[in-house]
A protein has these predicted regions:
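Short, conserved helix/loop micro-motifs enriched in His/Cys and acidic residues
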Residues: 30-38, 100-114
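An N-terminal amphipathic alpha-helical segment
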Residues: 68-108
Length: 176
């Protein structure tokens, strides 16, 4: 199937949308739609933002819940409220608008707080971002033991080797 082709990798949401569209409107020219989809797939690898969104989509498909912390002063309450659910969360700590250019080029690393049960690994998130060509650096990790749940919060920085060291804001020599 097309999903196994490298040009279409990470486009599951697009295929789902296309299926729904074709199921409701049979007058759509399928050949042109598929051609556009193929061109988008080929171009996606060229843009950091597409690869970033593809990685987040893959994480979501594995059950990770994605969110953004709009204000730094709300980080603690956002983290604790997500930890109380006992589920796996990826909390983005800086805005996409501040980390990517309007053309989709990454300007600085994206910081995440991975919130998950201590008994579960979060390495699948790291593997997904690595598979999309990003490099990773760990920040701090803390244990959250409230509400009878043993949860962890780990900071993960996602970027690429072309970013200036000063943009990382961390000891950038220990990439994963």
């Amino acid at each position: 199937s097309a999903r196994q082709m490298s040009a279409f990798r990470g486009m599951a949401e697009e295929f789902t949308t296309l299926r729904k569209l074709l199921a409701t409107n049979t007058d759509i020219p399928v050949a042109n739609t598929l051609k556009s989809l193929l061109e988008s797939g080929n171009n996606a690898a060229l843009y950091d933002l597409y690869r970033f969104r593809s990685a987040l989509s893959a994480c979501r498909s594995l059950g990770w819940q994605i969110g953004t912390c709009a204000w730094n002063d709300q980080l603690l309450s956002e983290t604790l409220s997500r930890a109380q659910t006992g589920k796996r969360h990826i909390l983005q700590l800086n805005s996409t608008r501040d980390t990517f250019s309007t053309t989709g080029r990454m300007l600085r690393p994206v910081a995440f707080s991975l919130i998950h049960p201590a008994s579960l690994e979060s390495s699948e998130v790291e593997d997904i971002f690595r598979d999309e060509g990003f490099i990773l650096a760990h920040g701090r990790e803390c244990s959250l033991n409230g509400s009878g749940r043993n949860m962890l919060s780990r900071i993960l920085h996602v970027g690429h080797s072309g970013l200036p060291k000063a943009e990382w804001g961390i000891d950038h020599s220990n990439h994963l």
